[in-house]
């Protein structure tokens, strides 16, 4: 294999921040060929009604062909296992009805993916466009990340504080887009192994890499 193409299907556009994490996991699991990630931007497609998760997965594979499909759902207020089972049912439905056999991995952060972006202060400063900033930032400890009720708002507040902007300049600060950039400034995601949801994802990726002989 000269390259490995993966497609990420997410709840929303800001969740494409997961891509550097997924690429890092693949590398850590032994993938040495070129990795070509793409985010499935289904919002560009004209689709009637509200497609089911299985239908969205089918569209992702059809319009963004890949060797591996990552399917993201935030657990939010649901137990992580509920979301995981939901994705697995959709995978089974897709394979029965559409004969799509692309390998798939469930990506289910507890609460929401922003919880996985709250451990690297320097990355937050870089993403905020103020890498030399001196405004104190209070990051939660890694052990409590999965218990934070609204990690997105915590991340957004950190980015606003890190920017050290105020007034109209702060009003024009696109915090959601800045949040997407955080992972691009992180080289090592190993601290997240302390989180059960992340550890489970790494185990699933490792197992699939071995099954597919990608290492």
Residue ranges and their predicted role:
Residues 8-10:
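Short hydrophobic beta-strand that contains or immediately precedes a catalytic carboxylate
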């Amino acid at each position: 294999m000269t390259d490995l193409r993966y497609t990420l299907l997410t709840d929303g556009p800001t969740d494409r921040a997961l891509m550097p994490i997924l690429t890092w996991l693949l590398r850590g699991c032994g993938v040495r060929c070129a990795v070509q990630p793409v985010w499935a931007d289904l919002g560009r497609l004209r689709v009637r009604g509200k497609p089911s998760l299985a239908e969205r997965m089918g569209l992702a594979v059809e319009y963004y062909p890949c060797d591996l499909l990552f399917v993201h759902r935030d657990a939010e207020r649901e137990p992580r296992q509920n979301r995981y089972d939901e994705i697995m049912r959709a995978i089974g439905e897709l394979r029965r009805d559409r004969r799509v056999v692309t390998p798939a991995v469930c990506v289910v952060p507890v609460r929401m993916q922003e919880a996985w972006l709250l451990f690297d202060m320097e990355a937050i400063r870089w993403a905020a466009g103020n890498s030399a900033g001196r405004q104190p930032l209070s990051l939660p400890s890694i052990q409590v990340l999965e218990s934070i009720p609204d990690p997105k708002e915590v991340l957004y507040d950190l980015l606003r504080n890190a920017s050290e902007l105020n007034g109209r300049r702060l009003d024009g600060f696109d915090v959601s887009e800045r949040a997407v950039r955080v992972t691009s400034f992180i080289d090592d995601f190993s601290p997240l192994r302390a989180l059960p949801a992340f550890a489970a994802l790494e185990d699933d990726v490792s197992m699939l890499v071995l099954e597919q002989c990608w290492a």
